[in-house]
Amino acid sequence: MPKIIAFDEEARRGLERGMNQLADAVKVTLGPKGRNVVLEKKWGVPTITNDGVSIAKEIELEDPYEKIGAELVKEVAKKTNDVAGDGTTTATILAQALVREGLRNVAAGANPLGLKKGIEVAVERVSEELSKQAKEVETKEQIASTASISAGDSAIGGLIAEALDKVGKEGVVTVEESNTFGLELELTEGMRFDKGYISPYFVTDADRQEAVLDDPYILIVNSKISAVKDLLPLLEKVMQTGKPLAIIAEDVEGEALATLVVNKIRGTFKSAAVKAPGFGDRRKAILGDIAILTGGQVISEDVGLKLESTSLDLLGRARKIVVTKDETTVVEGAGDPDQIAGRVSQIRNEIEKSDSDYDREKLQERLAKLAGGVAVIKVGAATEVELKEKKHRIEDAVSNAKAAVEEGIVAGGGVALLQASITAFEKLDLSGDEATGANIVRLALEAPIKQIAFNSGLEGGVVVEKVRNLPTGHGLNAATGEYVDLIGTGIIDPAKVTRSALQNAASIAGLFLTTEAVIADKPEKNPAPAVPGGGGDMDF
């Protein structure tokens, strides 16, 4: 594929044009009076959204240099979304402001590397100041406020706060589409995994189609069980205790399954068999989690344990196990709290070391099942377009609320960045191009609050000057046009979201400013194919 190359000012301006097109489409969504953007889909109905990263992902430009510029800014939105789950619009606006001011100075003769150094130092100081400003989330109401702002709906915010309150900060909050209208919160106590009973004959509650075992023994096996002679010695021991038996294994089949089913139907012995969740190493790890949660051991030949010689003390215990056709819930496992805590910290370390998003997500699920609970928010709406938009907003708001719990909250509405810069720049001692770089950051930090004001029909410059002279934490409530104590009135942002947005924007801005050449694929010139004739004298 032939390439085209642009140098110096031409290269940077091409990138900037692409960035501006993307940023201008994204920034109309910022603030309580931000607008929506409609995204055309090749198949199905269009999507309506005000989520920065969703809009950014859809933008594909024709000009090769502009396309690269847009892709670089997309990376800001994606990275911020990955780290904090929200703040993508703020990150895009900050990147645009930093690049615009930076390129102006480069064109005027400033050294790009000096500017980059100044930007990095200033951003580090502002990030430190944001951390100092951050207040810990102490109440359910504060979680509700930050989630409400992200979702633009106080009912959603309240529901998310309730979900996080129930499952704890390590718990999982998932969002699912529902066939019914409105919002619904479903809580799961204990550990739940997505595997149901192997045979419907295990059902004990015919109305609900559930197998419910009270105070059961739990056999956890990392292999298939098919020969009844392997299982029989253990079945006899469990029968003598009068307790039911839950079996979690790779599979239960053949005469072993038939024996369990026949005894259940006759009322001789109550049991339920479930396939182990996951595959390969992940299955092994999940079975290990279940064993620690229930105080049992995984029966596996890898550790020298055979099924036929298993004793009762190797089985797990729980207050109750509920098995449906699709999922199994273990309620109040009898595991040792110290061992569970050890397993939790081990999984946390694995999450920190993991490079793969997929692995991290799966580890996070395992952590939640061990340390917290699972809350499912079910979303329903009148149309598919509204349903997708609502679901997306709720997912963003859940990430936002979790980020608030993690690193605390700061004043919202772009005020935290502006006020952090006032204090941070008092301590900076830079000269030359580095001082110019720091000044670029100071000007860029006004961009989010100016955009919120603009989207609300106010004059950005006037709002910035007014907020500069207010006490820390006070600023514009763009929804009402009043200047208030933002934290007191619940207009807050998670510190993690604000910090990530600034750091990711500065990272890309530095790359923009130090770019001296851009190499892109040469656009192909495809002449339109000739239209075939109508057939002339041909016989059909």
Curated annotation (Swiss-Prot):
Q: Which domain of life is it from?
A: Bacteria
Listed GO biological process terms: protein refolding
List UniProt keywords, sorted A-Z. ATP-binding, Chaperone, Cytoplasm, Isomerase, Nucleotide-binding
Report the EC code(s) recorded for this entry: 5.6.1.7
**Record: residues binding ATP:** T29, L30, G31, P32, D86, G87, T88, T89, T90, G413, N477, A478, A479, D493
Signal peptide per UniProt: none
GO molecular function annotation: ATP binding; ATP-dependent protein folding chaperone; isomerase activity; unfolded protein binding
Q: What is the lineage of its organism?
A: Bacteria, Bacillati, Actinomycetota, Actinomycetes, Frankiales
User: What biological function has been recorded for the protein in this entry?
Assistant: Together with its co-chaperonin GroES, plays an essential role in assisting protein folding. The GroEL-GroES system forms a nano-cage that allows encapsulation of the non-native substrate proteins and provides a physical environment optimized to promote and accelerate protein folding.
Species per Swiss-Prot/TrEMBL record: Frankia casuarinae (strain DSM 45818 / CECT 9043 / HFP020203 / CcI3)
Kindly provide the name given to this protein in its UniProt entry: Chaperonin GroEL 4
> Is Cytoplasm a UniProt keyword of this protein?
yes
Identify the enzyme class.
isomerase
Q: Where in the cell is it found?
A: Cytoplasm
Question: Which transformation does this protein catalyse, written as a reaction?
Answer: ATP + H2O + a folded polypeptide = ADP + phosphate + an unfolded polypeptide
Q: Give the family, as the similarity comment puts it.
A: Belongs to the chaperonin (HSP60) family.
Spell out the PANTHER family in the cross-references: 60 KDA HEAT SHOCK PROTEIN, MITOCHONDRIAL (PTHR45633)
Subunit structure, interactors included:
Forms a cylinder of 14 subunits composed of two heptameric rings stacked back-to-back. Interacts with the co-chaperonin GroES.
Instruction: Give the CC-aspect GO terms.
Output: cytoplasm
